[in-house]
Amino acid sequence: PPLPEEAMRGKVYLVGAGPGDPELLTLKAYSLLKEAPVVLYDRLVDERVLALTPGEKVYVGKEEGESEKQEEIHRLLLRHARAHPFVVRLKGGDPMVFGRGGEEVLFLLRHGVPVEVVPGVTSLLASGLPLTHRGLAHGFAAVSGVLEGGGYPDLRPFARVPTLVVLMGVGRRVWIAKELLRLGRNPREPTLFVERASTPKERRVLAALEEVAEGKVEVRPPALWILGEVVRVFAEKEAPVDALALGG
């Protein structure tokens, strides 16, 4: 049930922290972080972004194997919204792209708490590569490598997408690559992994899809994985891979 009127005080801002580089924050995100009395932040938020806020910082990130349950995050948001004029809920990338932002918005609205979404630069764009390119890739799709409860995604809808971006798929890269090959993607299709995009620790790894399927590629999370001909043109031919970094 909605909270009593008198219990409501604060507004919750669901803010995208971008892929890492603090200079990729929106002006609104920067302003809110500078003024926020409390910031509830996720695991993948860059420490340089957190350093911008003088307010209280509450970690609510989800580590593999152990995590704050989403319900507990909801309770914390309600508690802080009651206690402060406003609250920043800070998520890596964009809060509405694989960030469970929609769940938090619905929960807060159901409980009578006003919410505003402040978009961030999604990590889908953090490679600096074009996901679409005239005459080469007329569309793209993004898929999570891990579903709720640790399930595996159905990759059939993505078999023929010109550019495919995989998030949270590093630990399952061999399975994903094998499944995409089984579904008909080109074994020699170029792919690019970008570890810790837009940060000083960024690392890029180029590999054919079949090489990934054979377990020949060493990558550490968090990493973005891009598959498609845009990788061949922009990362192999026309520009050095390192020249395409986004921020840093």
Name the predicted role of every residue range.
Residues 46-48, 65-67, 122-126, 149, ...:
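Short gly/pro/ser/thr-enriched loop/turn and capping motifs at secondary-structure boundaries
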Residues 49-50, 108, 127-128, 176, ...:
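Hydrophobic packing residues within well-ordered alpha-helices of enzyme cores
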Residues 1-4, 19-21, 48, 124-131, ...:
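A broad, low-specificity signal for short, low-complexity segments enriched in glycine/proline
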Residues 94-161, 203-206:
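Class I SAM-dependent methyltransferase SAM-binding "motif I" and its flanking Rossmann-like core
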Residues 56-62, 112-116, 132-138, 184-193:
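Short hydrophobic/aromatic-enriched beta-strand-loop microsegments
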Residues 3-22, 27-118, 213, 223:
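Class I S-adenosyl-L-methionine
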Residues 4, 8-12, 82-87, 137-139, ...:
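A contiguous loop/helix-start segment that scaffolds small-molecule binding in enzyme catalytic cores
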